Amino acid sequence: MFLLDTPIVFELRKARAGGAEAGLTAWASGVARERLFLSAISLVELEAGVAEATRRDKAAGAALRSWIDAQLVPAFEGHVLPLDAAVARRRGQLALAETRDALFAATALEHGLTLVTRNTAAYRGARVKLFDPRGYTADAAEDEGDWRDAARTGPLWLKNLFVRA
């Protein structure tokens, strides 16, 4: 199962217009919804993104707000992981300089998830499982072939969330 870093979520949003990195889109289209999680930190960062976008361009801010409220939050209902005492305790055990990165790593470790991020260097020494989907191809999947056949709703779910025009 996977915890999505906020930049991954933002990049997947670009897939709606065909602008997301191909490897990321290929990977995400093969993952069942039940296997994906967000951190509450991502919601905080997305809200900051709405505020920033609204300051620059009200229409862009409104579009981002609509996507978060109408698609993202409902799709991840029950899959948004909190910053609780266990995550805080785990964060304290990690020797990472950036609090944000340490909280993502702690959340992934506490819940037994693989952190999907492009910034793998930020997590060196955290002993967290990492996955960088850039350059991913379906043929590159090592042991994931069988579950994709069993989870046929995964690709449709992600297409509806991120790809539909």
Task: Describe these PLM feature segments.
Residues 48-50, 74-118, 149-152, 157-165:
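Active-site neighborhoods of divalent-metal-dependent phosphate/nucleic-acid chemistry enzymes
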Residues 8-11, 48, 89, 122:
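Active-site micro-motifs of SAM-dependent methyltransferase domains
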Residues 13-16, 50, 95, 126-127, ...:
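Short, flexible helix/strand-to-coil boundary loops that buttress conserved ligand/catalytic motifs
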Residues 3, 37-40, 82, 117:
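Short aromatic/basic micro-patch
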Residues 102-142:
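Acidic, metal-binding active-site segment of PIN/NYN-like and related structure-specific nucleases
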Residues 1-38, 53-66, 152-165:
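Short, well-structured N-terminal submotif of metal-dependent ribonuclease cores
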